[in-house]
């Protein structure tokens, strides 16, 4: 089953780097929360998110973990849809999954930058394939995620 999560980045730190036309827009904020029911009624155990964050560090390091402007219908991102690249991802002691991304100069990245410049609150979403088990507090994402 394709699991899609979307969180509005409530407290986003916007960082403009560089000068003139060479500026880069970076966003930092809370991407997800461990062990709490999210907006879609799912709970991601910390152990699962820790293993996923660890598994994608190489992609983050070589700048190949790109994201799209809109939700793709499946778990694949096509480079023609890219709007940002994830540049950092970690889990705090309180279980907050904190992330950083750089907005790309692609057409979709330019749309994201325009939305941010116009004061629109944007969200961040994650996708993955896995199963869930019905729990007392919500649907718990299983180890096959």
Where are the language model's segments positioned?
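Polar/acidic, low-complexity leader/linker segments enriched in S/T/G and N/D
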Residues: 1-60
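A structural detector for beta-sheet-dominated domains
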Residues: 15, 28-32, 68-70, 80, ...
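Residue microenvironments linked to proteolytic maturation
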Residues: 87-145
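Short loop/turn segments at secondary-structure transitions that flank enzyme active sites
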Residues: 33-37, 73, 105, 130-132
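A residue-level signal for beta-strand positions that form part of recognition/binding surfaces
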Residues: 24-28, 64-66, 96, 123
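Short conserved beta-strand and strand-loop elements enriched in small hydrophobics
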Residues: 61-77, 124
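Low-complexity, polar-biased intrinsically disordered regions enriched in Pro/Ser/Thr/Gly
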Residues: 15-18, 43, 77-79, 112-114, ...
């Amino acid at each position: 089953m394709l699991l899609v999560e979307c969180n509005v980045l409530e407290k986003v730190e916007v960082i403009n780097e560089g000068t003139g036309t060479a500026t880069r827009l970076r966003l930092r904020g809370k991407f997800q929360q461990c062990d709490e029911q999210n907006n879609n009624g799912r709970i991601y155990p910390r152990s699962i998110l820790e293993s996923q964050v660890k598994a994608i560090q190489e992609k983050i390091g070589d700048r190949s973990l790109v994201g799209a402007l809109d939700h793709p219908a499946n778990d694949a991102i096509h480079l023609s849809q890219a709007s940002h690249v994830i540049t950092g991802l970690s889990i705090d002691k309180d279980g907050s999954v904190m992330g950083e991304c750089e907005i790309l100069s692609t057409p979709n990245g330019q749309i994201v930058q325009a939305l941010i410049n116009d004061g629109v609150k944007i969200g961040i979403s994650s996708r993955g394939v896995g199963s869930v088990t019905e729990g007392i507090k919500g649907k718990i994402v299983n180890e096959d995620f």
